Amino acid sequence: MNRRSSYLLGCTAFILYSYETSGDTKDSCVFPFNYKGFTYFSCTRTNSLSPWCATRAVYDGQWKYCLIEDYPRCVFPFIYRGRSHRNCIVEGSFFGKLWCSVTSSFDEKQQWKYCEINEYGGNSFSKPCIFPSKYRNHIISECLEDESNKLWCPTTENMDMDGKWSLCADTRISSLVPGFPCHFPFNYKNKNYFNCTTKGSKENLLWCATSYNYDQDHTWVYC
């Protein structure tokens, strides 16, 4: 049997088996999970045409197809080819898309995902973060971590009143890594920036602020 036939047979077996083992799609993915002796830190296509995850730490027949919000968040910094990376990278990507490791060492686990460059999920139709925002009578200016280790943000100026939120883009959360100089978002001339910008640069070079309020602190670095 050639490799293609073996793969198709495996997919068919998984699909047929799934009719009897499929878990409730409302269940959450559990990472890491063990499936047939292998440990998975993210959704997988093993024996399936679509990405899926187990909803138990040890696969017992309960699983679900992965939605975008089911994927784990990026782990920064991570090791790739012996180098430490504090943000999403395109190195090694066949399609030039940003990606990240979902463990601290890609070299060791080879577990990864494509990076989300915009906010997603939540209850506000994937609207972007709004900072600063009021939450539990505090003013917040960065993404917050929930009980499932996901990072989220308010999408209105008053989370306490409106209750609207999204999951934070992977490209945004790198700003929370200790030692990463940029602060995203940062406010420059009364406008929020979520990525490096050339605005205000006489040399037309990308730069970012290292605190939320550039107009107040005037601290910045080139990207």
UniProtKB/Swiss-Prot annotation:
Residues 24-68, 69-117, 124-170, 177-223 form the Fibronectin type-II domain. InterPro entries: FN_type2_dom (IPR000562), FN_type2_sf (IPR036943), Kringle-like (IPR013806), SP_Capacitation_Regulator (IPR051666). The keyword Cell membrane does not apply. It comes from the Eukaryota. One of its GO terms (biological process) is sperm capacitation. The keyword Disulfide bond applies. Keywords: Disulfide bond, Fertilization, Repeat, Secreted, Signal. It is found in: Secreted. Detected in epididymal duct epithelium and on sperm membrane (at protein level). Residues 1-23 form the signal peptide. Not N-glycosylated. Its main location: secreted. GO terms for cellular component: cell surface; extracellular region. GO terms for molecular function: heparin binding. Disulfide bonds join 29-53, 43-66, 74-100, 88-115, 129-153, 143-168, 182-208, 196-223. Pfam families: fn2. Belongs to the seminal plasma protein family. Binds to spermatozoa upon ejaculation and may play a role in sperm capacitation. Has phosphorylcholine-binding activity. PANTHER family: SEMINAL PLASMA PROTEIN, SEMINAL PLASMA PROTEIN HSP-1. This is Epididymal sperm-binding protein 1. It comes from Sus scrofa.
